[in-house]
Amino acid sequence: MPGVIMDEPNVGGHPKGPSVPDSSRNGIPPLSGSDGAHGVSSAHNDGANRLNGSAKGIDGYKQNVDSSTTKIDFVGLRQPPELPHITQGFFPFSKLVNRSVQQCWNELSELITELAEVQVPPQDSGPLPGAPNGKPLGNQSEQNLQKKLRLLDFAHSKRAEFIKLLVLSQWSRQAADVSRLIDIQNFIRIRHQAYAGALQCIGDMKRDLVQAQVGNPDLKTALEVLAKGKVVSMPTLGYKPPRPLTAKGALKRLQKINRLISARLVLSDSVPTPFQTYRVHDGRVTFIVPDEFELDLSIGAEDETSQFYFVDIRFLFTPSSPIPKGRIFNELDMRINDTLRTKGLAGCFDLLHGLVLTTKINALFKQAAELARGLWSDTLRVELLHRTLVLQYWTLRPGPKSWLEIGIKSGRRSSENSINGLPSIGLRWIRDGQEVDSRDIEFDSKNLSMECILRSVIALHTSHILSSAFEKLSKHSLFSTGALSLRGRLSRTEPGACQLDVQLTRSRHLRVSVEPMSGTSILSTTPSTLERSDVDRNTDKPFADEIVSRVARLRCISAIEEVESNAKLLGFQVVNPRSLKLDFRRHFPANILRFSFFWHRSWERNWVLAATSSMDGDSWWVVQLQPAVPSESALPFDANSGISAPRSAQIVCNTFFPAPQHNMKSPFADMGHSLYGILTMQANARYLADLQSISFHPPLPQLVIEASLQVPDILIHYQALKLPRAFQVAMPAELARRSFIKDTIRLAFSGVDPHEKAAVLVAYGELLSPPNDVGALVSKQDRSLVLHHGGNKFAIRLLTAAGRSAMCELLESLQRLECALSILETLRRKKMQPQSLSLSRVGFLYGPRAELSANIDINLTTSSTHTIIDPLHLVTQEKPLFQLRLGIAFDYPNPHRRMQGSFTSLLNNAGATSSLGTVTGLLSVTLPLMQALDGLMANPSHKDPLRVQVIARNAKTFQIHYPMQKVRFQLLITQRPNSLVWVLREAGGLQGRSSEDQLKSRLKERLYHSKGDGWQGLENGVVATIDKVGNLLTELDKCFSGLDDIPILNQSPLETKPIPSKPTMGNTEPAASGNTVQNARLENKSPQKAAATHSNADVITID
């Protein structure tokens, strides 16, 4: 039985032997006076209670030794030997009980916890049904019943276990008897084994003694030999020794053997195909098997059926050594001869062919083991399985493994490279866990070199990896289009010669190779400028994909670093993407591996450049940020700059560096210039796209930098009448009759102004019907406008910051040009002589001899800062941004300079009689008058007192006031049936003044009832022609020239208020601000009156 459960807790002991017995054995106390060494025990009255004898400790044993020897010997003759006690597999019953109780408690606790988690629905408050015995049934829900059932099952199972424990407890009270039975059975088994062992030993001895038998000596024959020197009873055969062979005889015999061998091989013997190459010489035939061995055979009889005999063998491959003479050679000789006797030449070849193949594999195994212990340690694993050599290389590389198997192919498959189906050494190549063709492996069966085979395998593996990487890289547009070079060098025998040269940028190159021993990819750059470690490798990818990803990553890093270093030289600042709050993957393609953002101090802060690099190409992007709020600060971007997510991102160039040309001194500087221009053009095109009411070409996706780094132009469809209302300029009715500009405007980038640090844009256009010689009117110093001499083309120069739209300035300038051309046409129609032309002024000459000059100013004012207004807001805005106000200016000494305010008001009034034609007509009409007034004002000394005042109510009405006499006259233009005339009337001052009769009589006599050159009195006024009004004013002034001695009573200060030196430019004509006052000063002959008059001269003359 396997074990006994004892009721006592201290049961135990050594498994075998009575060396150190326990204090009790099998539950029986030891017997005193026993000797464990001799198996002797004392006789006691309680001997019936012990089993298998008893044992004592060592102390008891020593005590017994000191006892009487006679007693011990006597007792030893009577007592049986001590039996070994078996205690292996015994354990206390109390431990089983404790374990069972503990397990029961644990399971009960778990059950209570589980049952507590079960939710039992509450019992209904109604009357409960009673059981047959009259007791209530309680809660009869399914959950409650399930809980009760589980408790009942647990109690039943544990009850069964404790019943088993009870049975074991009752049985263990008789365990002592069972233990004694186990000890007896063990004793019997040991005795049986000793008996069987004795029999076996005797049989072996009997068998071995057979070889030790020696025959009895033949004393009789020995005595005869010693006495006579011979044995008479031994028969003789009569053989005669052969005669010694001479050289000639030996040669004849060898030649005869050669003939016999040749005849046999040709006529009778079946020579296998591998033995077809042979030569017969020196009485033997030498079979030659290329790359394997040379076999020498000979014959022992002339009979054709006799066998060949082995003579010698030589291996034809290296490394190999000759078979040493001795036991090995003899065994080979015997084995070959037996094969020749039984299987002939074919069997001999099969034997030796297999021997050679095995020898070659063993030689390769030894070489591989030496490599694994030498330079290839830790990277090479070698194993020989029967006759198959397994060589695993690149053991430290993660991922699928690669190995080479060199074994013997049976040759039964027709596809195998074997001769007539013979076995041969074959290669099986497992590359990255998959079997591939091994025919390209360099294997020399004659000169065996495991290192050459291994290097060939690694070279082919490396070539496969690099060629796969080459194919994957060549699919990217950078290499497929020839923008970057990609060249691979492969080898079948030398892994160090396998390289992949990749051009990262125009100045940086990368060489990819694989370290032969460890299989690690090596990437080296030229020049070596990449300092960051390449640690982010993905071991889950195939090796070729890993190389491609690393090459792509390094190429993009190199390209971005080179761009950043060149961009910083041009003043570009690298912008941290975090400060832009930019989700890069949302606005840019997913294949981009590296990117960088740039900004320049002269750009608007809502535009940046992005340089992106991928294996499909390097690109420049123009990124517009939102909100588009320009900033005056030129500080770098930060998180608090107020710029949020990008609004748009547009690719503008597909290369970082332009193709080098003979006229390029600094290619990247030219690229920076083009980037500056394309950003400016993109900003304007984006502004037009947002307006949605002005068409343009090319569209935004096609607005990119050209191959020659030329910034493309934008063609804008311009029609002033179809512009949004916010951009339209309200022209005067006379100027807005027709358009002067064709509807196509070409906007071109023309560089950067070094002083203003702004982009220069030029708008080119054509005139529909250009005036004659209009190009000569534009001054060469005016850089804002150029008109082609003798042609119909013009150009407008604009300055704007990069990233800021110039559309408002362009539309304003175009409408200014149309306004200037309309004014020019009107002047020529009015027979005026144009002198100059610009976007803000038109100069012309007038007068009888064109001796007077004037300038019409074109002033456009804006109601707000339109450069920061959202174009989407401008589309719906009805209020125009531009307010047109024309002005006219006269240079000194033009007499019309005193009428400048009146003419300006007349130009800007909305009345039907207010127009440029009216003003030009009034210039001719009022010129004689203004010249006459200038004559009245001639006062070189500027010391004479104030004598006359002229107030211009408007360009057609004047008031002449003599303050000292308090007399006013009104001079105005009146239309007669055939012409215009000036009419002079009294405006007040002479009625009811008797003291001024002399003045009245003078006026009537000289003016009202008189007639002069170009004028005529009308009794109550005077009328004068346009060109002779000066004569009238001269005669009028003469009427007052002789009145200096006439006293004027009740003289009061002048009622006229001081007039400002420059009139107010208003739309109406108030008397105080819109009039022009002209003062004439005449000589005063009375010093006292001159002083008094001078003290009261507080009227300011407008000049």
From Swiss-Prot:
Domain of life, per lineage: Eukaryota
Species whose genome carries this gene: Aspergillus terreus (strain NIH 2624 / FGSC A1156)
Location within or outside the cell: Nucleus
Protein's name according to its UniProt entry: Mediator of RNA polymerase II transcription subunit 14
Positions of the UniProt region annotated as Disordered: 1-63, 120-140, 1054-1103
Main location: nucleus
Assembly with partners or alone: Component of the Mediator complex.
Pfam families: Med14
Described purpose of this protein according to its UniProt entry: Component of the Mediator complex, a coactivator involved in the regulated transcription of nearly all RNA polymerase II-dependent genes. Mediator functions as a bridge to convey information from gene-specific regulatory proteins to the basal RNA polymerase II transcription machinery. Mediator is recruited to promoters by direct interactions with regulatory proteins and serves as a scaffold for the assembly of a functional preinitiation complex with RNA polymerase II and the general transcription factors.
Key words, A-Z: Activator, Nucleus, Transcription, Transcription regulation
GO MF annotations in UniProt: transcription coregulator activity
